[in-house]
Amino acid sequence: MNFTDINPDLAEIRDGVAKVCAAFPGEYWRKCDAGNLYPEEFVSALMKEGYLAAMIPESYGGSGLNLTAASVILEEIHRHGCNAAACHAQMYTMGTVLRHGSDEQKSKYLPKIADGSLRLQAFGVTEPTSGTDTLALKTTATRDGDHYIVKGQKIWTSRAAQSDLMLLLARTTPRDKVEKKTDGLSVFLIDLKSLIGKGVTIRPIRAMINHNSTEVFFDDVRIPADTLVGEDLVQLFIPDLGQRRIHHQNQADGDGYVGGAHRHPLQHGRQTVKKTAQGNTQRHSSK
């Protein structure tokens, strides 16, 4: 959808995003994919122009834009062949903190997320035995005085290695002791980077498409009790999941990775065949 047909004021946002994307051509993204690299320069450029803080209220240093404006940002990024994954991740994870975090959590973290001094781009949900069945997750957070002790494993967690903070979904009440399936699961906002080497281990996962995927291990990790965001999974998780789906749709609507292949199918096909052939040649030559 072209949102600027509905609200012409959004054309300025499109133009601004387009200018940022112009400095990051296809070669930049091919290098990122080939090396499984995080697009550091691109993310920094978006942050400098305020796009990663689009939905953070002005009172916390953000732009205070609505979901439609954020959708335009993501769509335009992909329209120009860039990858908006880091941008959309920060938008929806930040939303959980904004809507459900304590005043202390919002005051402590949102201004730093808005100015780029902290990144919140990781959400620890999926586990080896609970892909689509989130309620079956096994990572536990057990209360111990003014701390929780976290034990478990997350997998396919994008950008954990590049994120300062993580939203973590963990079981705080055993599944056999709750009345409703959705009870007993809590969301925490943890200082992930400070916990590396203190019970947290992050390992990269090499995949066909570069999303900076990782698996994250929690080995009796102590986190402060005030990192708890909330315990009502339905209120905490479902609204943000809906926003995430909207963001994914916006990216698909863009003419980047999806639309670019339709606009230039012959060129896209030739590049794909060429890269495949080169890869096969290199593998055979090394034998």
PLM feature spans:
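A short, Trp-centered hydrophobic/proline-enriched beta-strand micro-motif
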Residues: 116-125, 169
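N-terminal glycine-rich flavin-associated loop
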Residues: 85-104, 131
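Long, acidic (Asp/Glu-rich), low-complexity accessory segments flanking structured domains
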Residues: 220-235
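Amphipathic, small/basic residue-rich leader segments at the start of a protein or domain
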Residues: 1-87, 104, 108, 112, ...
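Short linear motifs in low-complexity or flexible loops
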Residues: 252, 261, 272, 276-277, ...
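A short core secondary-structure module
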Residues: 151-199
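Flexible, small-/acidic-enriched active-site or ligand-binding loops
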Residues: 136, 194-222
